[in-house]
């Protein structure tokens, strides 16, 4: 069957977006992997699905599948693209859009300048909520990889993140160490791994090795988790600009119990049809 889709990106983190309100389909993991292939398929980091909400306080249901076919809880860059998609496709005329994810409700705001602000909700820091194997909640945890000890912060932004502070993101072993930490036994559900370089209290650089996708040009939840980790370590102010390989995001966080706010672009690349 033929399915209509839209190719979008947020800072180079690219998505295939499918409206399953006006059309019907079911994506099996092997189909997602085939579509994600950049040589033989559409090519994307994640597949984003727009569905009717399953609860009365939401406007839509938002589902995310990684390129390896696994379904994940959250994607910040995808959320911005989701907001622009439902507005431009006239699926809603609301300015503030409430979206149901696997880990709860997030709120999306399409600004007049075309940027999208996402209320990502409050970060979860208790080890059991991330999940991360630790006896008590700390800002920094020692973690061993191949006999070497590292210091990591563990944060959930609806999906699990580990954040390391590095001197230079360009020299950080993102692929080797990122893969090892993604699959570390202390992250039972695997994790996205961020490498954070603090330039000054309101500006930082970040590279992210995403769970199930590898390093991407940008990771919205990773940027949020990095600011939370930086704030918990006393390195960052409440409003920070994060420079990722694909561009910049503005992140703000007042502190524990408060939501993380993320603002950045969402770009529509093209519309197409594909047979599944």
Swiss-Prot record:
Give the pathway. Amino-acid biosynthesis; L-lysine biosynthesis via DAP pathway; DL-2,6-diaminopimelate from LL-2,6-diaminopimelate: step 1/1
In the record, biological process GO terms are: lysine biosynthetic process via diaminopimelate
Q: Where does substrate bind?
A: 13, 46, 66, 76-77, 159, 192, 210-211, 220-221
Q: Where is this site: Important for dimerization?
A: 270
Q: Which domain of life is it from?
A: Bacteria
Active site (catalytic residues): 75 (proton donor), 219 (proton acceptor)
From the Swiss-Prot or TrEMBL record, give the protein name: Diaminopimelate epimerase
Please name the source species: Hahella chejuensis (strain KCTC 2396)
